């Protein structure tokens, strides 16, 4: 049979090869840009201008994406990933990198800082909810604790921008003006953990009314903090410094937990420094802390470490167990004075105290009554003991977050098995009305 000249001769037994991709034909909506490509004008209405002091003369178009390990090289397009996934869709799923914004863009987004301020219990600094570069965001104004050069900020921002985890609120970018740094975070719909546990309008109600909902929060926060300590900083010992119940967002409608203010301590110059001069300077500076979450060594030196993060996390776990604040004051009628009660002390009494009722009885009496006594006692006791290990006074005796996250994951699985066993049968109907 004659073959037409317009059709190529093809071996019926051969396997067709995937076509080579042309880097010059990258889709326009791709989130991966080359270093020489100019940012799209649709990403922000405010033109990019050089940063104000102390970064005068530098371009704000710098993004940490140039050094991010999440870039998708065009050479991998020669390999077929899925018949349903295109290169552009893969690029769209890659996390975006944090960037340095023009201060004029922050000023325009906040209406020259005259816009309605966001009521945030997670931070004592001023904050605004606004739209920055087309994204719903929260802008926090914080004071720089030490002078930082341009290279210092770029180095820290590069490391932080490579860190992406489901339990961490994403940092979109920063801007610096004078002695203040403006941290731009994504806005997450939900409420902070402290408000979820303690509703002043209705103290008998909580959205976290089941044991599994609280175990989910504990697991999310443990793995998020483990990621910050052991993965996010790569070769740097990253410290969060602001671990507290008001700094944890319980998302809607999934009721998962996200840690707020990741990278704030690093970018504000609040982290530990090396050398005798740096130690003396840190001792002279004022430091911020929340009562009940500060470890003994942090209160003595003002220096935050990973061990002080572990201490604060242990306090958060005890909050989840009881629903109470870390420290409260109770009036003592015999002395006529108020007595400070720590959730750490009550936890130790619950698992280590004496009495005829035993550990189970003391634990049931100590745990949040709004759980309606429906929780696995064995898992609750083990979780309490893990938290007490985290809040030991000697920082060297505290475990690291990798060990803690592993223990809590096992307790989560054990609690899940318990929840499946006690789950109410759906095929049985119950009526409490009189017949």
Residue ranges and their predicted role:
Residues 309:
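Conserved catalytic-loop aspartate of Hanks-type protein kinases
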Residues 343-393:
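C-terminal lobe substrate-recognition/regulatory segment of protein kinase catalytic domains
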Residues 123-146:
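Glycine-rich ATP phosphate-binding loop
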């Amino acid at each position: 049979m004659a073959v037409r000249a317009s059709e190529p001769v093809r071996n019926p037994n051969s396997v067709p090869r995937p076509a080579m991709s042309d880097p010059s034909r990258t889709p326009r909506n791709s989130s991966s840009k080359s270093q020489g490509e100019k940012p799209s004008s649709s990403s922000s209405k405010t033109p990019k201008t050089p940063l104000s002091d102390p970064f005068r003369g530098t371009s704000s178009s710098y993004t940490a994406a140039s050094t991010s390990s999440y870039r998708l090289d065009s050479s991998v397009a020669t390999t077929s990933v899925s018949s349903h996934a295109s290169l552009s869709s893969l690029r769209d799923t890659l996390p975006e990198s944090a960037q340095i914004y023009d201060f004029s863009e922050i000023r325009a987004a906040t209406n020259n800082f005259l816009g309605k301020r966001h009521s945030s219990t997670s931070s004592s600094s001023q904050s605004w909810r606004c739209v920055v570069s087309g994204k719903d965001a929260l802008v926090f104004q914080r004071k720089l604790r030490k002078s930082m050069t341009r290279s210092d900020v770029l180095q820290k921002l590069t490391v932080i921008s490579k860190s992406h985890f489901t339990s961490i609120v994403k940092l979109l970018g920063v801007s610096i003006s004078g002695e203040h740094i403006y941290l731009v975070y994504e806005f997450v719909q939900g409420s902070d953990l402290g408000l979820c546990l303690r509703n002043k309008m209705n103290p008998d109600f909580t959205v976290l009314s089941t044991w599994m909902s609280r175990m989910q929060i504990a697991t999310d926060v443990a793995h998020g903090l483990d990621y910050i300590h052991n993965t996010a900083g790569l070769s740097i010992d990253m410290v969060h410094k602001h671990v507290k119940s008001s700094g944890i967002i319980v998302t809607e409608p999934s009721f998962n937990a996200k840690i707020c203010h990741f990278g704030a301590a690093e970018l504000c110059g609040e982290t530990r420094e090396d050398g005798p001069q740096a130690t003396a300077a840190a001792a002279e500076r004022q430091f911020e802390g929340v009562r009940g979450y500060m470890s003994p060594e942090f209160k003595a030196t003002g220096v935050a470490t990973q061990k002080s993060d572990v201490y604060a996390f242990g306090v958060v776990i005890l909050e989840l167990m009881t629903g109470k604040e870390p420290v409260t004051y109770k009036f003592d009628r015999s002395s006529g004075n108020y007595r400070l009660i720590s959730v750490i002390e009550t936890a130790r009494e619950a698992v280590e105290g004496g009495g005829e009722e035993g550990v189970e009885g003391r634990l049931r009496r100590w745990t949040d009554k709004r759980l309606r006594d429906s929780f696995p006692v064995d898992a609750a006791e083990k979780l309490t003991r893990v938290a007490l290990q985290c809040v030991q006074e000697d920082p060297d005796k505290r475990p690291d977050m990798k060990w803690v996250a592993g223990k809590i994951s096992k307790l989560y699985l054990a609690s899940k098995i318990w929840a499946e066993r006690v789950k109410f049968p759906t095929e049985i109907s119950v009526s409490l009305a009189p017949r």
